[in-house]
A protein has these predicted regions:
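Short helix-terminating capping/connector loops at secondary-structure junctions
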Residues: 2-3, 29-31, 78, 108-114
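Conserved catalytic core of nucleotide-sugar-dependent glycosyltransferases
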Residues: 81, 90-165
């Protein structure tokens, strides 16, 4: 049996936006919740100076705190696959289905856990790299060695590489998502 639990970690959204999100979630059959982020839970864990030797901005502190909270929720509540998605991504209606089926197929073919990135970033085509192409359910997928903070992975990968994931939330790297590339 497949279970979905949609969790939105929110920081300072307008009430009208939260109401609209809740309205859309209520139309679904998914278990869902909206959690208000408390920055004080994470502020002391974030280094105040970043990789460029500049002060970390309040906006970046909220972003890092949000990611940290999302990782903790996944670690404590997820049983199988977890999809981390930033708030500025649009999806085709069948996107999540495709990702789950592609994950199953590719993980079975390679006999290993994956990090699946649903977005094909144009900047990744600026260098010539050999890659592998995999067939998903209806789309093709290619191997890359970097991503941003929108990806699907297993709880096993999250637990195995917990320190790398959390390091994004404690120190502002350059690029920010550098720990995901290592």
């Amino acid at each position: 049996q497949i279970e979905f639990d949609v969790v939105i970690v929110d920081y300072n959204s307008k009430k009208s936006d939260l109401d609209q999100m809740q309205k859309q979630l209520n139309k679904s059959y998914f278990k869902h919740s909206i959690i208000s982020l408390n920055l004080n839970e994470f502020k002391d864990k974030i280094k105040k100076v970043n990789a460029e030797n500049k002060n970390v901005t309040e906006n970046q502190i909220s972003n890092m705190s949000n990611i940290h909270k999302s990782l903790l929720i996944a670690k404590n509540q997820c049983k199988d696959l977890v999809y981390f998605v930033e708030d500025d991504y649009l999806h085709h209606q069948e996107a999540v289905r495709e990702m789950i089926l592609a994950y199953e197929r590719i993980a079975s073919q390679t006999n290993r856990e994956l990090v699946l990135c649903p977005t094909d970033y144009p900047y990744l085509y600026t260098k010539i790299d050999s890659t592998n192409i995999f067939l998903g359910s209806t789309k093709h997928w290619r191997v890359i060695d970097e991503t941003l903070c929108t990806f699907l992975t297993s709880i096993n990968i999250l637990q195995k590489h917990w320190d790398k994931f959390i390091s994004m939330c404690q120190f502002e790297h350059l690029p920010f998502d550098q720990p995901l590339h290592d």
